[in-house]
Amino acid sequence: ALLGACATPASGPSASADLLARSGSAVSGKVSFSEAGGKLRVEAQVAGLTPGEHGFHIHEVGDCSAPDASSAKGHFNPAGKAHGHHAGMERHGGDMPNLLANAAGEARFSGEISGLSLGGATGVVGRSVVIHADPDDYKSQPAGNSGKRIACGVIVAD
């Protein structure tokens, strides 16, 4: 009668974005999202980057059609705050840690972002995820001086 007691709980809702190369880059990859414990879990696997750090943000609009990804608009900012460090209180909801690409141009990220969800007013579904050419300095306004947008993916529910 207790056979199911140790079963892994069913996974909750999730979403993902397939990255499209933009601004002449060769970037590709996938970013996955799930909710757990009131935080948004983000997993990314990216290739085709230059080695080093790259700005990594959720943007307002789920539109990656522009060649430079400008159609994604600015950082998702449901609380109306200034741009800042992803771990700080004063930041855009869409501010995430820089991706670190290895010598082969590959980056992986796994972490939790507070203040965001899959749906609702703080929801990421229907928005976009963008990778930038340069690192986010976590202070310059409005976007961390992270350079051109080299990859963009629309976040869709799985």
Language-model-detected regions and their locations in the chain:
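N-terminal leader/targeting pre-sequences
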Residues: G4-E53, I58-D158
